[in-house]
Amino acid sequence: MVTIGVDEAGRGPLAGPVVAAAVVLCKPRPSGLDDSKKLSAARRAELEEKIKRRCRWAVGVVEPDEIDRLNIFGATMLAMTLAVGALCEQLAHDEDVGEVLVDGNLTPHGRRPEWCWPARPIVGGDALEPCISAASIIAKEHRDRLMREAALAHPHYGWERNAGYGTPEHLAALREHGPTPLHRRSFAPVAQLQLL
């Protein structure tokens, strides 16, 4: 039986996808795992490389139009489901999922029809469970990379620095240049601009 850790990145930004990662840790696991928000960018990048090289992992990405259609909670549950499903495709036929540990107080169980794994929510799990810590690192690094790439096509918003969050720089650019296709139209600061 394997244990899968799941976490997401990007619930709060005004732009870009929500990304979930699922990880089955290797033995021995990479040392220094912690909540991705507590790690420096350099340490996250180093751990991401170790996790990707030695452990099994997958990501699920839900784009802004789907976030607007489902709402951010539904999109997060979908991203988690996609990540775990993709990871399960990598498991050997004789490996069963014992449990999916999900950061937070809710899981996709009963919320997504495709979810078929035993799941346990753990509040603060990204700092408590190493497999969730690993997932938080993979999710954050993957999403940050997507936003840096998006910044090349949309340079006014500072996404390479703010990852799509509603910083003063991003809000000022949004007022001046308007929303892009990567903006979440259902999020208040973007929706309010559309009413003007």
From Swiss-Prot:
InterPro entries: RNase_HII, RNase_HII/HIII, RNase_HII/HIII_dom, RNaseH-like_sf, RNaseH_sf. Its EC number is 3.1.26.4. The keyword Cytoplasm applies. Manganese or magnesium. Binds 1 divalent metal ion per monomer in the absence of substrate. May bind a second metal ion after substrate binding. Keywords: Cytoplasm, Endonuclease, Hydrolase, Manganese, Metal-binding, Nuclease. A divalent metal cation binds at residues 7-8, 103. Residues 1-196 form the RNase H type-2 domain. NCBIfam families: PRK00015.1-3. This is Ribonuclease HII.
